[in-house]
Structures are given as C-alpha cells and as structure tokens.
C-alpha cells in the first residue's frame, strides 16, 4: 500500500495535498483497494461550498457506493473532469491522475486536524 509522507489524511480515507493557498483532495490507495473497481465518480461543481467532515460526492465501485467526505471547509475551485470518462484512474493512480477536487480553504489551519501518513497507516493497520 502506498501512503505518501507529504500528504495529510482523514479517518474516512481521503488525502490532502497543500498547494499554495489551495488543497487538492482525493481518496487513498487503501480506500481504492477496499472498494474494488471504480465505475463512477460523482463530484461537486466548481464554486460549490464544502464543509469539513461532510459529504461532497461519491465513488461507485462494482461492490458498493461510498461517500466522499471533505477534509477541510472551503470553496471548490477545480474539479477533475477526467474522472467522468475515466473513473478507473482512481484504481490506477489514486494520488496523481485521480485527484477529485481542489478547494480554496476558509481556514488552512484546519489541515492540522488531519492525520499524518504515520497516523493514517497506524489507523488502517489496527483494522
């Protein structure tokens, strides 16, 4: 399982990468492997407001539908439209091609509430 050290993580298996004043959000390698083959991704529109710990979209796999939870509150400034035609990117490249949304946070310090890579790995290893 791949857990990049420079990212922050949620207990719901989203990852966050700080990029200047914005954050890029996706789901973890662990999450995609648990879900199985992803067949559909539903994401919000640019301009939508997201609230920390609240759903902002969903991923549908051959096994189940799983909600996506915002790790931080703010405004969606970019959406990965490529996932409309290529949901399989979530399985193939969860930290690169399969980012979900970019958010301009209301308060970037909310990132401090998220898990480090080490904390996230410990959580999933506890099962």
Swiss-Prot record:
Transmembrane segments: none annotated. Binds 1 lipoyl cofactor covalently. GO terms for biological process: glycine decarboxylation via glycine cleavage system. Residues 22-104 form the Lipoyl-binding domain. Coiled coil: none annotated. One of its GO terms (cellular component) is glycine cleavage complex. Signal peptide: none annotated. PROSITE patterns: BIOTINYL_LIPOYL (PS50968), LIPOYL (PS00189). InterPro entries: 2-oxoA_DH_lipoyl-BS, Biotin_lipoyl, GCV_H, GCV_H/Fam206, GCV_H_sub, Single_hybrid_motif. Its cofactor is (R)-lipoate. The modification N6-lipoyllysine is found at residue 63. Keywords: Lipoyl. Belongs to the GcvH family. NCBIfam families: gcvH (TIGR00527), PRK01202.1 (NF002270). The glycine cleavage system is composed of four proteins: P, T, L and H. The glycine cleavage system catalyzes the degradation of glycine. The H protein shuttles the methylamine group of glycine from the P protein to the T protein. This is Glycine cleavage system H protein. It comes from Geobacillus kaustophilus (strain HTA426).
